[in-house]
Regions:
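Protein kinase-like catalytic core scaffold
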Residues: 137, 200-201, 268, 281-283
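C-terminal active-site "lid" helix and adjoining low-complexity regulatory extension at the edge
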Residues: 243-251, 260-265, 274-307
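Hydrophobic alpha-helical segments and helix pairs
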Residues: 101-155
């Protein structure tokens, strides 16, 4: 009997791996975890044989993993140089770590994105805001996740106060995006999930009290204003924050499938909001995607992201 290849899970957040571990053990998959931050590596050696799955997250530095960018890029490059099978490799890592790159790639493929001005250096934020000159606007760090550092700016005076009081969160690469806040008639954003390059399901996320978004069971949060959308109406507290759409936009899913394949992205969640004209505006690509078990259980779709 032919030996099964061992799976290697490359990550920097133990908490997010809990459901993946359960799924791997359920299917009797032999696996090993590589937690990447500070490290040493002998690049003259060959890596082990196996399948390598990168679960690196752009929010790594918010957990004080300050060297995850460098270590993950080195490890994935080393693996690819030895022709190992890597899921979400170095090309995808660049996309995960840069919201500017995400916006550029989406625009290049014809997807609508928010009006955006990029500021490199905190001293350029006010100039970028003046150039955008659309209020309210959103400021977010180029590398980020779970809404870290995303803030709403209603006026230029409000921005002045934020800068004066050091209320703009630092960015790992000293780069920020200033984006228009999209007007919408919807009470939710949409996140389309893809695994193996295939569309799995579409998740509606109702926002309440935060810019944070993490659909995983490990980080159930209240949501509001976390993406570049206008203020929306409160929803009934009895409704779940996350639920799976029984009637997803299949044409849009097909377009995104082509886009992800073009950029070698095998696992991802892509987020958008529809403006008042019903046009989807894309603002985020999550290549370290997680899944909400409660939403999956309550859905008629009968699909489990981890399995």
């Amino acid at each position: 009997m032919k030996n099964k290849l061992k799976a290697y899970i490359i990550h920097e957040n133990e908490e997010w791996l809990i459901p993946l571990r359960k799924a791997l053990e359920k299917f009797d998959v032999q696996y090993e975890e590589w937690l990447l931050d500070d490290m040493t590596i002998n690049i003259d050696q060959s890596p082990p044989n196996g399948i390598f799955f990168s679960r690196m997250s752009a929010s790594n530095y918010t957990r004080n993993h300050l060297h995850s960018n460098q270590s993950s890029n080195i490890i994935l490059t080393w693996l690819e140089n030895h022709n190992r099978r890597v899921i979400n490799g170095t090309n995808v890592l660049k996309i995960e770590f840069s919201k500017v790159l995400q916006q550029l790639l989406l625009k290049q493929s014809g997807f609508k994105t928010p009006k955006t001005i990029v500021a490199v250096g905190i001293n350029k934020i006010k100039e970028a805001a003046s150039n955008l000159n659309v209020y309210p606007m959103i400021i977010k760090p180029n590398q980020g996740g779970k809404g870290f550092g995303v803030k709403l700016i209603n006026t230029i005076n409000e921005l002045d106060e934020m800068l004066e009081d050091n209320l703009i969160n630092s960015s790992k690469d000293d780069t920020w995006l200033l984006q228009e806040k999209i007007s919408t008639n919807e009470e939710f954003i949409t996140r389309m999930e893809f695994i193996g390059g295939n569309f799995i399901y579409s998740l509606k996320v109702f926002s309440k009290n935060s810019f944070e978004l993490c659909p995983a069971d490990a980080c159930e949060v209240d949501l509001d204003q976390f993406c570049p959308v206008d203020e929306i109406n409160d929803i009934n507290n009895s409704q779940p924050s996350f639920f799976i759409d029984d009637d997803p936009d299949k044409n849009l899913a097909k377009q995104l499938t082509i886009f992800l394949k073009k950029h070698q992205i095998e696992v991802a969640g892509v987020e958008f909001i529809r403006n008042k004209d019903g046009v989807p505006i894309f603002y985020d690509i999550n290549t370290n995607t997680n899944y909400n078990l409660n939403a999956e259980k309550e859905s008629k779709v009968n699909k489990n992201g981890m399995e």
